Swiss-Prot record:
The keyword Cell cycle does not apply. The gene is atpD. Component of the A-type ATP synthase that produces ATP from ADP in the presence of a proton gradient across the membrane. GO terms for cellular component: plasma membrane. It is found in: Cell membrane. Gene3D superfamilies: 1.10.287.3240. This is A-type ATP synthase subunit D. It comes from the Archaea.
């Protein structure tokens, strides 16, 4: 929108100045929000990387123990034990809000984790070891999924916030600044013209008074 479309009046000048102040306040708030979002984002990314590395190492250990159990028990026996179990894991989901961003919270219900479907005495100790390690790791895997979703939400909100700041910088602020300058320029020109007009009028009146004597 062109600043020249704004009617150059004192009322509009006052209104534009007030709106300009408000826009600058909004921009500062958005910039503060951006900084806070960046802090949260860095925190969650660091946590994600830490847990990811832990899960990666833990899964390697689980796989190593599992393969040793396969050697001891045979793949057929292992598959029979695995197929005897039903899918019973249950997750509890909720959300929390950070600066207007909905953050998912996911927890594994401990009660839904089935007990070991085999006897530790009759089966390979490596199988029991793989089970225990996998049970511990499952909680972290779910935490990773939660963190990934959180990071995506924060990044999306950060991008929206940055777009608003960019719009203010490149479009809104220039329009209001130019409008204020335009109105002020027109009013100043009018004021100068009025001053010159009054000065000329005063001289004419003075001449007339002089001629009337």
């Amino acid at each position: 929108m062109s600043s020249r479309r704004v009617l150059p009046t004192k009322i509009n000048l006052i209104s534009m100045r007030n709106q300009l102040k408000l826009i600058r306040v909004i921009k500062r708030l958005l910039e503060n929000k951006r900084e806070v979002l960046l802090i949260y984002l860095r925190t969650y990314v660091n946590e994600y990387e830490k847990i990811y590395n832990e899960v990666n190492e833990a899964l390697k250990e689980v796989y190593d123990s599992y393969m040793k159990a396969v050697v001891d028990e045979g793949i057929g026996n292992i598959e029979t034990i695995a197929n005897s179990q039903n899918s019973s894991l249950q997750l509890k989901s909720s959300t929390k809000v950070i600066f207007g961003v909905k953050i998912p919270i996911t927890e594994l219900s401990e009660a839904s984790i089935p007990p070991k479907p085999f006897s530790e005495v009759e089966t390979s100790p490596y199988l029991s070891e793989a089970y225990d390690r996998m049970r511990e790791t499952m909680v972290k895997v779910i935490k990773l999924v939660e963190l990934e979703s959180t990071i995506r939400s924060l990044v999306a909100e950060l991008r929206r916030t940055q777009r608003l700041i960019n719009a203010i910088d490149t479009s809104i602020l220039p329009f209001y600044n130019n409008s204020v300058k335009y109105i002020r320029s027109i009013l100043n020109d009018r004021s100068r013209e009025e001053f010159v007009r009054l000065k000329v009028t005063r001289r004419i009146l003075q001449r007339r008074r002089g001629d009337g004597r």
